[in-house]
């Protein structure tokens, strides 16, 4: 059982699945189906701990709570008019922005005998981010940033401005700890898009829904490039990820899905498609 965040990160083997450069046709529904698939195989002990990196172009990922917005379709129409695809993920939380300047990382562990408490999974991801960003001498803090989109206790920030958010999903004995990292472009412009989405989807009900949906202040969010005043790309973060995972394990290797995993993935993708069809018709 892991006692410290570093214990979770130090694995005999790390399997890596890199989906960070699949391009605009890579649909975000595939990503959430993929993580559920990997949770199953890691949870069963068929696969070692797995790190999956993923990038989706111009996509807004809604949480289940967002589907209860009173004027949801108006909000979706606004996002689509800005050129974004909209999907609903299979877990809680609230809306986030994905584009080609945002790197997502999923760490998938076996939850052996329920040995990984929720905080430990989050703290392992925080520790990995601190290691990845150590060369930039940045002081990274983990606490909720009010005014950001999809706020949570493990928002990552520098000087009070959020650049990353962490979530967690548990499926069939596996734990997927997921982070989105805003590498470049404007963090405040991403936040303003979500602010306008909630305005359109709430209209005159904003006061009724205070505390349910965030009142977004775009100035609370920024990209790493903005915060560190350096050009930091998704590729730079990918290199840092692989470097740290290699240092934390005796064997780092890349592997696609097995035949069994492919079959499970197809089932999970159908479930994701059905979930989205219920919301979007």
From Swiss-Prot:
Keyword Protein biosynthesis set for record: no
Gene3D superfamilies linked to this entry: Bira Bifunctional Protein, Domain 2 (3.30.930.10)
Catalysed reaction, written as an equation: N(6)-octanoyl-L-lysyl-[glycine-cleavage complex H protein] + L-lysyl-[lipoyl-carrier protein] = N(6)-octanoyl-L-lysyl-[lipoyl-carrier protein] + L-lysyl-[glycine-cleavage complex H protein]
Site residues (Lowers pKa of active site Cys), renumbered to this chain: 162
Catalytic residues, chain numbering: 150
GO MF annotations in UniProt: lipoyl(octanoyl) transferase activity
Disruption phenotype: Cells lacking this gene are unable to grow in minimal medium. Addition of lipoic acid only partially restores growth of the mutant strain but the double mutant strain lacking both lipL and lplJ fails to grow in minimal medium containing lipoic acid. Moreover, the lipL mutant cells grow as well as wild-type in minimal medium supplemented with acetate and BCFA precursors.
Highest taxon of the lineage: Bacteria
GO biological process: lipoate biosynthetic process; protein lipoylation
HAMAP family reported in the protein's UniProt record: LipL (MF_02119)
Extra remark beyond the main annotation: The reaction proceeds via a thioester-linked acyl-enzyme intermediate.
Family: Belongs to the octanoyltransferase LipL family.
Protein name: Octanoyl-[GcvH]:protein N-octanoyltransferase
Organism of origin: Bacillus subtilis (strain 168)
Record lineage: Bacteria, Bacillati, Bacillota, Bacilli, Bacillales
